[in-house]
C-alpha cells in the first residue's frame, strides 16, 4: 500500500492511497473459493460449485465488497500511522478501481483541534442567592387561595374586581363578525387578565342582564396574526355574576394540598420559590461563564461543526419570533457575521467542555438525562407527559440529549470545584429584575 500525504495543515489531512491490483485479486479469489463451499446453485452439489460459476454470479458484488473493505482498512491504517484525532467520517474522492489498474483514491479527513484547558481557578463569578421572605410565601398562598375560590353566591350588584362573570360575546372588526370571535357561557374573573387587555375592566359597573359594547385593540404580538394590532368591538351580554366565598388560609386549607399544616405548606412554597429561581440562576451563570471562556479560547474548529451549528442557529431563529425581530433590520452581511461569531463561540465552548469532561472522567448517570428531559418538559406546560413519553419511546432522541447533559454536568463540576464563586444576596423582587436584565443581554447566546 502506498500513501502520499497531500495536505497536513490546520485541521485538514488529505492523502492519496494506492493498493496493488495483485492484493485485490488475491482477496477476491479467496472470497470466491470460500463461497464455493457455501452457496447453493441448481445443478451442482453443495460445496462442488465451480469457481467460474460462482465468479459469474457473485464476482461483481464480491469485488465491490473487497474494495470497500480495502478502503476502510487503508484509511484506518493512515489514521493510526499518523495518530490522527478525527471527527466525522473520512471523505473518499477520486476513486479509481478499474480492474486493470491499482486501487487508488484520495481520503480527506477533518481533525479535532488540540485543546488547552484554561485555568478555571483564575475565573470568578457572582452567584446570586435568593433570600425568600414571609411576604413572598404569603403571596403564593394568596394566589393559591384565589385559584380555589368557590363562586357560589350569585350577585345582583354591579360588577367589581374579583367577581366571576358569565358572558356571551360576539366580536366585530369594521362591523363584520370575525372568525373565532364568539364566546358562549364564558366565565371570567374580573382582574385575571384572561381576556384581551382592557376587556375585563369595561365590564365593571354592569349588572346581570345588561348588554354592553366593549372596545379593545388586539396586541401587536397576538397569536392570531390576522387580528394582531386591529381594533375590535364586542357586543357582550352579562348572563350571571357570582362573588366568591371568603377563603380562610389555615391548617384545613393546607390539608387540601397534601400538607399536614399551614406551616408545612409555607415550607413547601419556600422550597418551590428557591428551586424555580435556581434553574434561572444556573442558566445565567452558565452564560456568564461562557462569556469569559469566549475571550480565552482561540483554537480553530472543524468546518463541518461550524456549518452544522450555523444551520441549527438559522433554523431556530426562523421559528423564534423574538430572535427573528433582533435581526430583521440587519443587512445580510451583518446577519452572516453574527451567525459566524455565535456558531464559533458555541462550537469552541462545546469542544472545550467535552475535552474537560474527558479529562475529569465525568460519566453520565440516568439522573443526568432525567434532569435534561425535565428541562425540556418544562418548556411545554401542560404537555409534560407527552414529552416524557416521546423520549421513553425514542432511544435516538435520548442519544441527542447526551451531549447537552454531559455539557451541563461539566459546567456544574466547574462551578463546584474550579472557579471562584462570590455569593450575592437578592430579594425575590431584586432577583427577578436582575434575571430579566441578564436574559435580555444574553438573548440568542
Curated annotation (Swiss-Prot):
The keyword Chaperone applies. Residues 162-247 form the PPIase FKBP-type domain. SUPFAM superfamilies: FKBP-like, Triger factor/SurA peptide-binding domain-like, Trigger factor ribosome-binding domain. Its main location: cytoplasm. Keywords: Cell cycle, Cell division, Chaperone, Cytoplasm, Isomerase, Rotamase. Pfam families: FKBP_C, Trigger_C, Trigger_N. It is an enzyme of class 5 (isomerase). It is found in: Cytoplasm. GO terms for molecular function: peptidyl-prolyl cis-trans isomerase activity; protein folding chaperone; ribosome binding. Belongs to the FKBP-type PPIase family. Tig subfamily. Involved in protein export. Acts as a chaperone by maintaining the newly synthesized protein in an open conformation. Functions as a peptidyl-prolyl cis-trans isomerase. This is Trigger factor.
